[in-house]
Curated annotation (Swiss-Prot):
PROSITE patterns associated with the record: ARGE_DAPE_CPG2_1, ARGE_DAPE_CPG2_2
Coiled-coil residue windows: none
Active site (record annotation): 81, 176 (proton acceptor)
TM regions (residue ranges): none
Full protein name: Peptidase T
Keyword Protease among UniProt keywords: yes
Gene Ontology, cellular component aspect: cytosol
Length: 410
């Protein structure tokens, strides 16, 4: 199993599948289509049935049931794309067997070193086989580790028919990293009662709470005149943007929050005297607090409009996704089965809120409750990203055990 994980994963990460937020195609990049087509062929080779790839790049397949019991159809999902935060082109994975727990020089020429001082969790992987970057790209373990684990688990179940299971559906989705993963996902065609995304991090991760999320785009309109004769005439749009930001509580930003604390995050600010544009994301686990945060944004805008004129500030604000907990709680048994599966494999479940979103956040509100499970990756979205093959193997075992337990308990 370990060699299959290494072979598949190192091959998959070499395919550039970064999504592109500026693209309006689906998927947003051709690399995702190329990767999807490859996976279609490999799913067929493994022995899965009903293997499809639709016009939007969504890959689906079926592991047929090998039991006469009436077992709920479950699904496992991962995403095809990698993050846009750092380059994902020409990924050169480096395999470190029997890792000694010390610093790894990823790139001597560029002096890129993965150190325990910067990443304190690193020594805990002593003795593992870990895969790193060469210091010039991200790795793409998010989410090619999860995707690999699903492929290997399905292959194992096909070749070990003594493990009884119901019908299992598999899906690989595009554009998750830019929040569009579920946009064209056909829940009805997928046909599962519930699913799990394999899109987590370190060993034991089990997540079924996510942020409530909104995005706010603010346009500040100024009046530009010659600065020498600007008195009582000029209105500086960039200063309006600064004034707006000054009304938000300083301590309620990502760099000051953790756990269940929400925040306002200024993602970008661009402009000049004539016009400036700011983009914020608003996040909170509690729905009432989430609505209160949006009200705060709206109230600041109203105050500034009263002060400077209606056209001085224009707000566009949209909800992006909601806390999946609301949809998971009524079917809590899907979390319990994953929890029990981990415990039976001597894995200590680490239940914590996702300070972000997964495809599962949106899919849960589309009628497919979908918690998230660990994959073994660390330091996602950058050159210090790595994955433990030993933990990937544990994730495969969890997938197999979940499928087995659903059949056993049917």
């Amino acid at each position: 199993m370990k060699q299959e994980l290494i072979e598949r994963f190192t091959r998959y990460v070499k395919i550039d599948t970064q999504s592109n937020e500026d693209s309006h195609t689906v998927p947003t990049t051709p690399g995702q289509i190329e990767f999807g087509k490859l996976l279609v062929e490999e799913l067929k080779e493994v022995g899965l049935t009903e293997v499809t790839m639709d016009d939007n790049g969504y890959v689906m397949a079926t592991l047929p049931a090998n039991t006469d019991k009436d077992v709920p159809v479950i699904g496992f999902l991962a995403h095809l794309d990698t993050a846009t935060d750092f380059t994902g082109k020409n990924v050169k994975p480096q395999i470190h067997e029997n890792f000694d727990g010390n610093a790894i020089t990823l790139n001597e020429e560029l002096n890129v070193v993965l150190t325990p001082e910067q990443f304190p969790e690193l020594p805990s992987y002593k003795g593992h086989t870990i895969i790193t970057t060469d210091g010039t790209t991200l790795l793409g373990a998010d989410d090619k580790a999860g995707l690999t684990e699903i492929m290997v688990a399905m292959n194992y179940l096909i070749h070990n028919p003594q493990i009884k299971h119901g019908k299992v559906r598999v899906a690989f989705t595009p554009d998750e990293e830019i929040g569009r993963g579920p946009a064209h996902f056909d829940v009805e065609a997928f046909g599962a009662s519930f699913a799990y995304t394999m899109d987590g991090g370190p060993l034991g991760g089990l997540e079924y709470e996510s942020f409530n999320a909104a995005g706010a785009k603010l346009t500040f309109n100024g009046t530009n005149t010659h600065p020498g004769t600007a008195k009582n005439k000029m209105r500086n749009a960039t200063k309006l943007a600064m004034e707006f930001n000054g009304h938000l509580p300083v301590e309620e930003a990502p760099e000051y929050t953790e756990g269940y604390e929400g925040f306002y995050h200024l993602l970008s600010l661009n402009g000049d005297v004539e016009q400036s544009k700011a983009y914020y994301i608003i996040r909170d686990f509690d729905r009432k607090n989430f609505e209160a945060r949006k009200n705060t944004i709206e109230n600041i805008v109203k105050q500034m409009q009263e002060k400077y004129g209606q056209d001085a500030v224009v707000l566009e604000m949209n909800d992006q996704y909601y806390n999946m907990l609301e949809k998971i709680e009524p079917v809590r048994e899907i979390v319990d089965i994953a929890y029990e599966a981990m415990k039976s494999l001597n894995i200590e479940p680490n239940i914590h809120p996702i300070r972000g979103g997964t495809d599962g956040s949106q899919l849960s509100y589309m009628g497919l409750p979908t918690p998230n499970i660990f994959t073994g990756g660390e330091n996602y979205h950058g050159k210090f990203e790595y994955v433990s093959v030993d933990v990937m193997e544990k994730a495969v075992q969890v997938i197999i055990e979940i499928a087995r337990r659903f059949e056993e308990q049917a």
